[in-house]
From Swiss-Prot:
Belongs to the universal ribosomal protein uS10 family. The keyword Manganese does not apply. This is Small ribosomal subunit protein uS10. One of its GO terms (molecular function) is structural constituent of ribosome. It comes from Chlamydia trachomatis serovar L2 (strain ATCC VR-902B / DSM 19102 / 434/Bu). Keywords: Ribonucleoprotein, Ribosomal protein.
Length: 105
């Protein structure tokens, strides 16, 4: 039988692309420093939500304003992680604007 390979999949989400790229670079650098193999960061499609509101509360129905929120996503796979890798990732501090989901497989 084949031996099952260990893998950690990290999904990052955020509204600010600069913070997100900085966080992914920080995670990749930490994982490589501890000796694990890293695949990524893979940019996933950006979700764009548009909200349309009336400019005036009373009249001018045709006058509207649009706002948008873009949600940027990244995917990182860490192959063959060691105990040092997991400990280093636990100690890593990320900015508040970045949502992180970690799945071990």
């Amino acid at each position: 039988m084949k031996q099952q390979k260990q893998r950690i999949r990290i999904r990052l989400k955020g509204f600010d692309q600069g913070q997100l790229d900085q966080s992914t670079a920080n995670i990749v650098e930490t994982a490589k420093r501890t000796g694990a193999r890293v695949v990524g960061p893979i940019p996933l499609p950006t979700k764009r939500e548009v909200y349309t509101v009336l400019r005036s509360p009373h009249v001018d129905k045709k006058s509207r304003e649009q706002f948008e929120i873009r949600t940027h996503k990244r995917l990182i796979d860490i192959l063959d992680p060691t105990g040092k890798t997991i400990d280093a990732l636990k100690m890593l501090s990320l900015p508040a604007g970045v949502d992180i989901k970690i799945k071990a497989a």
